[in-house]
Amino acid sequence: MKGLTCFLLCFLLSEAQGFEIPTNGLSEFAEYGDLAELALGKFHVVPGNRRSQEGVDQVTLYSYKVQSTITSRMANTVIQTKVVNHSPEPQDVVFDIQIPKGAFISNFSMTVDGTKFTSSIKEKTVGRALYWQARAKGKTAGLVRSRALDMENFKTEVNIAPGAKVQFELHYQEVKWRNLGSYEHRIHLQPGRLAKHLEVDVQIIEPQGLRFLHVLDTFDGHFDGVPVVVKGQQKAHVAFKPTVAQQRKCPSCSETAVDGELVVMYDVNREQKAGELQLFNGYFVHFFAPESMDPIPKNILFVIDVSGSMWGIKMKQTVEAMKTILDDLRAEDQFSLVDFNHNIRTWRNDLVSATKTQVADAKTYIEKIQPSGGTNINEALLRAIFILNEANNLGLLDPNSVSLIILVSDGDPTVGELQLSKIQKNVKQNIQDNVSLFSLGIGFDVDYDFLKRLSNDNRGMAQRIYGNQDTASQLKKFYNQVSTPLLRNVQFNYPQASVTDVTQNSFPNYFGGSEIVVAGKFNPEKLEQLQGIITATSANVELVLETLAEMDGLEAFLAKDRHADPDFTKKLWAYLTINQLLDERSRAPSAAVKKKITKSILQMSLDHHIVTPLTAMVVENEAGDERMLADAPPQDQSCCSGTLNYGRKVTPNSLPSWVNPLPTPRVPLPAVGPSVIEATPPPHVMRVENDPHFIIYLPRSQQNICFNIDSEPGKILNLVSDPESGIVINGQLISAKKLKDGKLSTYFGKIGFYFQHEDVKVEISTETISLSRGSRVSVLSWSDSALVLNQRVHISVKKEKTVTVTLDQEVSFSVLLHRVWKKHPINVDFLGIYIPPTTKFSPKAHGLIGQFMHEPEIRIFNERPGKDPEKPEASMEVKGQTLVVTRGLQKDYRTDRVFGTDVPCWFVHNSGKGFIDGHYKDYLVPLLYSFLKRP
């Protein structure tokens, strides 16, 4: 399936782009454009039920308080705000807070003009059911939802009456991980306006003792002298309480200068090489971070994506970073480079010592790389694994060394093996047990969940790198984290009769500047002390490290400090356990194992009252008749994908010949039986929601390009017209029930497929699905799952969800059903269509989608700030024209039909003018099965 374009087409509800439902009869969701205008992490006031800023001073931010307490790396943070409406008009107030990615929300409450809303944790489906029950009665006060980017957002909007007060309070918890020799505690401070009382208090309690502590200046010196730091031997207090005058950007300014982060960095004392073992309230925590050891030699393979999408700043920054990284290699290290696009190249076919001459030659090689072509991740990784395996088999590796592979890529595979689960399996089968794979995903076009599973499966970790001017420093920072292996094969051992439910206690490597944390349970009635024994291999010797902790060692210390959290060991154990279970769930080998793990995660989430990917927080008033819902960000994709290859043929042999000399026979497609076919959707396709929003994925450029078509209800748009193959796909528009904001939204209400050579017509509406073969007609309903088999055309209906139309068991088209509640005042049911890559279309294929079966050359350059700071602009050369495009987000509803998944794309204005051939009206056809007549 090389060189093919992958398409996704769907209508994006403008209402579905927000994450809140305002109160008191306001619109169900915020407008997409409006949402983009709301900077993350700020307080917003929306006067007069509009996004105007007139009269915002009539709403006062009375207080903005943040309290953080860190007890032995376990951080609990509370954010509390109070707002008063002095306006004679009702005002909409948005509570919009950023919290660290990976933190668990544990509580949320708010009081609106005397009415208190409190939270409870429910299993996600139960929580959503409660919310929808209230919504059906018109009793939903709002939708609150956290979402994941580099941070996670927690947001809700309320409407407050004149003279009313509203108070918000959010609790979350996280573990502080040691990185490059210190712990960082970051608090995002973006109140959005002057606050009468702005207070930040950070209390740090570390029984090991504080080695150092300082507060970083992230406000360009504006608040010099304002943070007050009091540091003791084992405790510290950081206070940040600027007055209203100090908050002002300038003495006469009404804008606040508080817009950034308060960052506290610290480290603790370490007297024992065996680490610090702490026991309290039936739980133990073992911290291990030895220093002053000789580094272990590394065998390191850098696998670098040099496909066309890396062109420009990404490649420039990667080269800059790699030159510095190569200079940092030690003389005892061995290394090589694998760079790949659709082809695989190696700087050296084997590992070489990191001498000055070899490093200089490698830097010259890196500097000459010119990005182009596709992305063959599968073969690139297998080549790197092969080099390491050969060196090991030939006895060329120091038996006491550490072997690492570092993958740097910015996109999904487009050449060779495309099925992510197959790549994951190939790597797992070929990599040796002593090799760790680290994956760095540049930008947002890469499937980060895949990289995470790939690395977690092979003793490594993944990290997202943001593709900007800072890429080089991010890459270097990551390398620094793994550049100094001090120990390998680290094992934590405790008496089995004394402890239970121990978290991960075996680690392939320990890197200098980091910390390993192990936790578990014990019975305090049967245990007075706990022994921990660590075995590991250093650069020079096999180590056996022993430590002993007393039961009452912490009790007296914690009792003296009212800020200390007596449940820190319990929370830390739960945090580690749940995250490790989530990782195991994403890599579960079978549905049965996944189900068992899911049950454990769910029970722990409910027991510890935290929002995880399997739970939701229901927020309701005392009467229980007004509700909000807070979900965790979408979880990683898991195991057990379907067996049907979605829209592409099975590759006969995904392993290169130099790895597996015996070619794998072609895997047959599954036989179509009586059950409904389900499959994992391909990573790149298209979607449509309203006015139709088209998204075109260009694999060579590895870019998503999107555009809107504004047409009239009843009109029929041609999506694909291929007279040579005899295939037509058209969509008929329907409209919303009434205007909204002066505009009548349109959607696809019918999708028509015509397979001329088979004399088969398929009509899919929001009510029925019909298959016509000559004079014979089969009609199906969305209310039941079903399967209709024709000689060459199969139709699979998944109840109230999707219709899959499969031709010759080779290519599948998916149509998604989007239902709205029956009495919705504006919206109607509609359809979205997804068209995958296929060789079924001839070179004569055209249409709004069909024309991109043959990918046009594009070049995106001169990226710059746009009118909206959240939406940068760029120039795009395509088809002999230079267009101005805008960066934005669209929704993919295939895996999450309710909230969708954000997909970044470059937006072409004026109904795709310049990107599509001609004008969009050229693609109107008279009938649902009409071929497009090209001028």
Curated annotation (Swiss-Prot):
Sites of Aspartate 1-(chondroitin 4-sulfate)-ester modification: 691
GO MF annotation terms: serine-type endopeptidase inhibitor activity
GO biological process per UniProt: hyaluronan metabolic process
Signal peptide span: 1-18
Record PTM 4-carboxyglutamate, positions in chain: 271
Modified residues (Phosphoserine): 455, 875
Entries under InterPro entries matching the protein: ITI_HC_C (IPR010600), ITIH (IPR050934), VIT (IPR013694), VWF_A (IPR002035), vWFA_dom_sf (IPR036465)
PTM notes: Heavy chains are linked to bikunin via chondroitin 4-sulfate esterified to the alpha-carboxyl of the C-terminal aspartate after propeptide cleavage. Phosphorylated by FAM20C in the extracellular medium.
Keyword Secreted: yes
Carbohydrate-modified residues: 107, 434
Secreted keyword on record: yes
Domain VWFA: residue ranges: 297-457
GO cellular component terms, semicolon-separated: extracellular region
Protein localization: Secreted
Positions of disulphide bridges: none
Keywords linked to the UniProt accession: Gamma-carboxyglutamic acid, Glycoprotein, Phosphoprotein, Protease inhibitor, Proteoglycan, Secreted, Serine protease inhibitor, Signal
Assembly: I-alpha-I plasma protease inhibitors are assembled from one or two heavy chains (HC) and one light chain, bikunin. Inter-alpha-inhibitor (I-alpha-I) is composed of ITIH1/HC1, ITIH2/HC2 and bikunin.
Family that this chain belongs to: Belongs to the ITIH family.
Entry function: May act as a carrier of hyaluronan in serum or as a binding protein between hyaluronan and other matrix protein, including those on cell surfaces in tissues to regulate the localization, synthesis and degradation of hyaluronan which are essential to cells undergoing biological processes.
Name of the protein in its database record: Inter-alpha-trypsin inhibitor heavy chain H2
Gene: ITIH2
